[in-house]
């Protein structure tokens, strides 16, 4: 195989691996590129490689996605195979048979590979809105913020980090594993989200602060219930964060007003000390929503500037979406 062709195959395998482990929508997979490569090849080796990068990947075997997702993926893979090859590939059909016999679940795993060779795995609800909240799934701005953090570890190293609206926990877990913070506080207001957060912290080998068996070189990790509308300056002062982050929390005007309110109270906590650095990442879905956020920041006396886009693309998220991150000065 020519070097260029080999590199193309490796990129294709990596794309399938990252998307499958993260349980991304099937339409986001590079199916056309796969079909083209299958037509150029007389054997099924590429499909075997894809199978071992996805369904049979060690991370997937330990923490599989939902049964329905794996079944749909394998069905699509078989379609592509049958379109260009007459000889069946037994491994594909055996893997599909396993999913047909497996029991369905409302939870599934999503895994994200880290540059260190490790990974972050999340147990998530298979429904976008579940238990009356959107916090049980990972949104794309959380992946964007995690990438930025991995590229800028000095912002977090040996510092106390407070995350507002942690959701499933992807950003914080990536920071804890890659950026060596002194302490990390995950926070959310919904009880079901907090329960899932605690589970995901433990799933990734981290210990919650009260655990006396916690590793000495690990950050102190806390999962806190925090309702932005009722949190007082006194309650917020207990966190003493050096850095505050949030991702995909600008989904409606009410949330924006609540976020700006809690940021004002965080600023008041440290009147005799340096205010925390604040980074807010979001997907630009509605320009009016973004405009409202910056307007309310101005009214609150909070300065902001757009953080330059980072270079690394580590995680699979929708490339057509516009992402942005603001650096706020309280």
Curated annotation (Swiss-Prot):
Which key words are in the record? Acetylation, Cytoplasm, Methyltransferase, S-adenosyl-L-methionine, Transferase
Q: What is its EC number?
A: 2.1.1.-
From what superkingdom does this record's organism come? Eukaryota
- Enzymatic reactions: L-lysyl-[protein] + 3 S-adenosyl-L-methionine = N(6),N(6),N(6)-trimethyl-L-lysyl-[protein] + 3 S-adenosyl-L-homocysteine + 3 H(+)
- A UniProt-annotated Pfam family: FAM86
Q: Does the keyword NAD apply?
A: no
An example molecular function term from Gene Ontology annotations = protein-lysine N-methyltransferase activity
- Positions of post-translational N-acetylmethionine modification: 1
GO cellular component terms attached to this protein's record: cytoplasm; cytosol; protein-containing complex
Q: Where does S-adenosyl-L-methionine bind?
A: 139, 165-167, 228, 247
Look at the named UniProt entry and state the broad enzyme category this protein falls under: transferase
Task: State where the protein is found.
Answer: Cytoplasm
Q: Which GO terms describe its biological process?
A: peptidyl-lysine trimethylation
List each coiled-coil range.
none
Subunit architecture: Interacts with FAM86B2 and FAM86C1P.
Q: Which PANTHER family match?
A: HEPATOCELLULAR CARCINOMA-ASSOCIATED ANTIGEN, PROTEIN-LYSINE N-METHYLTRANSFERASE EEF2KMT-RELATED
- What task does this protein carry out? Catalyzes the trimethylation of eukaryotic elongation factor 2 (EEF2) on 'Lys-525'.
The UniProt family comment states:
Belongs to the class I-like SAM-binding methyltransferase superfamily. EEF2KMT family.
Name the record gives this protein: Protein-lysine N-methyltransferase EEF2KMT
């Amino acid at each position: 195989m020519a070097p260029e062709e080999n590199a193309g195959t490796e990129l294709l395998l990596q794309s399938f691996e990252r998307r499958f482990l993260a349980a991304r929508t099937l339409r986001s997979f590079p199916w056309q590129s796969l079909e083209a490569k299958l037509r150029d090849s007389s054997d099924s080796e590429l499909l075997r490689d894809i199978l071992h990068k996805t369904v049979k990947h060690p991370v997937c075997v330990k923490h599989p996605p939902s049964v329905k997702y794996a079944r749909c993926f394998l069905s699509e893979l078989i379609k592509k195979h049958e379109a260009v090859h007459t000889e069946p590939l037994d491994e594909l059909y055996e893997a599909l048979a396993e999913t047909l016999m497996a029991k369905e679940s409302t939870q599934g795993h999503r895994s994200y590979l880290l540059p260190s060779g490790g990974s972050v795995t999340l147990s998530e609800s298979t429904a976008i809105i579940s238990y009356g909240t959107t916090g049980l799934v990972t949104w794309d701005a959380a992946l964007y913020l995690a990438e930025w953090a991995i590229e800028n570890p000095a912002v977090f190293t040996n510092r106390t980090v407070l995350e507002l609206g942690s959701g499933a926990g992807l950003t914080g877990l990536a920071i804890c594993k890659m950026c060596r913070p002194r302490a990390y506080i995950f926070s959310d207001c919904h009880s079901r989200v907090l329960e899932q957060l605690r589970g995901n912290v433990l799933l990734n080998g981290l210990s919650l602060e009260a655990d006396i068996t916690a590793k000495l070189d690990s950050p102190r990790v806390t999962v806190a219930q925090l309702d932005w509308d009722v949190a007082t300056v006194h309650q917020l002062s207990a966190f003493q964060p050096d850095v505050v982050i949030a991702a995909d929390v600008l989904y409606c005007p009410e949330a924006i007003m609540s976020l700006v309110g809690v940021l004002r109270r965080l600023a008041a906590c440290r009147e005799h000390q340096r205010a925390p650095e604040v980074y807010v990442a979001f997907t630009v879905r509605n320009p009016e929503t973004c405009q409202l956020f910056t307007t309310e920041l101005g009214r609150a006396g909070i300065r902001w500037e757009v953080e330059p886009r980072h270079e690394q693309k580590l995680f699979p998220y929708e490339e057509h979406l516009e992402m942005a991150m603001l650096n706020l000065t309280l």
